[in-house]
From Swiss-Prot:
PbH1 repeats: 228-255, 256-277, 309-330, 338-359
Protein name, entry field: Polygalacturonase-2
Temperature dependence: Optimum temperature is 55-60 degrees Celsius at pH 4.4. PG1 is more thermostable than PG2.
Taxonomy of the source species: Eukaryota, Viridiplantae, Streptophyta, Embryophyta, Tracheophyta
Stimuli inducing this protein: By ethylene.
Length: 457
């Protein structure tokens, strides 16, 4: 009931903002945070952030065999269930038995993966619901099996399914051994059919989740995915793969509500962060991205599907040497809406397309046919974005003829070419609510006469 009452409050705030000024079309971040924190605190009758911090404390000796510590937390160590951690022996059975013990515990649990060891794992799923809260401490390294035949479900390697009140951290490394998979990608070898490769770490249907202080490298495909989750805090992540690795998104957010991603460094061969349909109330703060394809909303609307993303704020990002900076990408033929999106305080360095909306996205070998419908893009704010573009076109709005981009606000934008050379903006079917101090800017031929009056260069 608490969630329902607060959700109604949040909807009232959204509605009120939509009938106010142009700028208020996007929810005020401080107000959003107040409501978000209030939902968490009332739902669990305590300070949720303090609760997460308490569960995340490192135990002093992470090689101890199972015990109950002085705080009443049961410590379950995978070594006591037979894990070898030698990088040669599969440790799935030990991990599964340890998880079953942890998940059935009536008291809070620390699930410990000790340091200085390399645990070889086939495909594995840690399933809930569990009886109590669990903090998974990965101090060592988890290494994926390099045998493709070990993956009956090609969509995942490590997954947490329907686990509530979960913390995952410890500073260890998740190594997907993606080098085994990448050559078989249709993006590397265009003669091959396009097939899934596993996501290294998937959280599905998890509520009240914290993922903190982890390293992920060389994922088979996506590094970390949050799917159908609610109330997520992800921070202090280090994610890296080759710039030429296919589809290796850093953090992928799908159908997830109330998620905060912060203090994270990502360099991959695809989107640093990708936010797709069903996601709402997403905040990404202090993100370093590059190489990769930037921070993206989408893609949305593929296969003529309906897609919705709303209330997304990207604040304080540094994007270096990436294909794109901040991007919204939708396919022709889709429907739905991407709305109430903010890109604030972003520094670009040698980025091919620093600001881009692409409503004609086509990520396949064969050409995409022209279609009438499109996902509507509206109420997007770009504010305090500066830096250098690796190409002449620093701002690219390629919006739909039938469903143009609406309610676009740009303030304090300064993007130049290499060595300070002038850059350009290309703007098709875009309608502005305001544009102040924007370099480069759309030409008078690309926008209406009324919109031209909004510009204050």
């Amino acid at each position: 009931m608490v969630i329902q009452r607060n959700s109604i409050l949040l909807l009232i705030i959204i509605f009120a903002s939509s009938i106010s000024t142009c700028r208020s079309n996007v929810i005020d971040d401080n107000l959003f945070k107040q409501v978000y924190d209030n939902i968490l605190e009332q739902e669990f009758a305590h300070d949720f952030q303090a609760y997460l911090s308490y569960l995340s404390k490192n135990i002093e000796s992470n090689n101890n065999i199972d015990k109950v510590d002085k705080n009443g937390i049961k410590v379950i160590n995978v070594l006591s269930f037979g894990a070898k951690g030698d990088g040669k022996t599969y440790d799935n059975i030990a991990f599964e038995q340890a998880w079953n013990e942890a998940c059935s515990s009536r008291t809070p649990v620390q699930f410990v993966v000790p340091k200085n060891k390399n645990y070889l794992l086939k495909q594995i799923t840690f399933s809930g619901p569990c009886r109590s809260s669990i903090s998974v401490k990965i101090f060592g390294s988890l290494e994926a099996s390099s045998k493709i035949s070990d993956y009956k479900d090609r969509r995942l390697w490590i997954a947490f399914d329907s686990v509530q009140n979960l913390v995952v951290g410890g500073g260890g490394t998740i190594n997907g051994n993606g080098q085994v998979w990448w050559p078989s990608s249709c993006k590397i070898n265009k003669s091959l059919p396009c097939r899934d490769a596993p996501t290294a770490l998937t959280f599905w249907n998890c509520k009240n989740l914290k993922v903190n202080n982890l390293k992920s490298k060389n994922a088979q495909q996506i590094h970390i995915k949050f799917e159908s989750c609610t109330n997520v805090v992800a921070s202090n992540l280090m994610i890296n793969a080759s710039a030429k690795s296919p589809n290796t998104d850093g953090v992928h957010v799908s159908n997830t509500q109330y998620i905060q991603i912060s203090d994270t460094i990502i360099g991959t061969g695809d989107d640093c962060i990708s936010i797709v349909s069903g996601s709402q109330n997403v905040q990404a703060t202090n993100i370093t991205c590059g190489p990769g394809h930037g921070i993206s909303i989408g893609s949305l609307g593929s296969g003529n599907s309906e897609a919705y993303v709303s209330n997304v704020t990207v604040n304080e990002a540094k994007i270096i040497g990436a294909e794109n900076g901040v991007r919204i990408k939708t396919w022709q033929g889709g429907s739905g809406q991407a709305s109430n999106i903010k890109f604030l305080n972003v520094e670009m360095q040698d980025v091919k397309y620093p600001i881009i909306i692409d409503q004609n996205y086509c990520d396949r070998v064969e050409p995409c046919i022209q279609q009438f419908s499109a996902v509507q893009v509206k109420n997007v704010v770009y504010e305090n974005i500066k830096g250098t573009s690796a190409t002449k076109v620093a701002i690219k709005f390629d919006c739909s003829t039938n469903f143009p981009c609406e309610g676009i606000i740009m303030e304090n934008i300064n993007l130049v070419g290499e060595s300070g050379k002038p850059s350009e903006a290309t703007c098709k079917n875009v309608h502005f609510n305001n544009a102040e101090h924007v370099t480069p800017h759309c030409t008078s031929l690309e926008i209406s006469e009324d919109e031209a009056l909004l510009y204050n260069y």
